[in-house]
């Protein structure tokens, strides 16, 4: 099977699970009244976790974490009702910190960035361009 989904009154309800064609779990998340609500986890084809976070009423809420395919941390991001808040931190695959962005009222208030060797550099990476699947 490739996915398992439950509907109630024509809307997604409960646990939704998807698998890669060879059986490895790809995605798992819960829905309530058709909206994403609860824990969401995605995995790469190699079995390594890709991202994990909570949705509430269809919006990202709380801490979201993501990882590179090699298992090293990619990002830690904070949300409230789908709006970016507080510090969002990003890393390169070599575990070197890439950037820290501080959000206030959903907008970048300040930022600091580094190159792959740990040297401070202008922030030309923008976290909004990185999308979850």
Language-model segments: which ranges?
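Glycine/tyrosine- and acidic-biased, solvent-exposed loop/turn segments at the edges of beta-strands
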Residues: 1-133
């Amino acid at each position: 099977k490739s996915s398992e989904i439950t509907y109630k009154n024509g809307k997604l309800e409960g646990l939704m699970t998807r698998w890669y064609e060879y059986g490895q779990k790809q995605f798992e998340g819960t829905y309530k009244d058709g909206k994403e609500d609860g824990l969401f986890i995605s995995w790469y084809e190699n079995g390594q976790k890709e991202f994990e976070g909570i949705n509430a009423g269809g919006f990202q809420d709380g801490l979201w974490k993501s990882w590179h395919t090699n298992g090293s941390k990619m990002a830690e991001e904070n949300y409230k009702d789908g709006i970016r808040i507080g510090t969002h931190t990003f890393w390169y695959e070599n575990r070197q910190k890439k950037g820290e962005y501080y959000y206030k009222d959903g907008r970048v208030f300040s930022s600091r960035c580094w190159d792959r060797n740990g040297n401070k550099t202008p922030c030309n990476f923008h976290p909004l361009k990185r999308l979850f699947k």
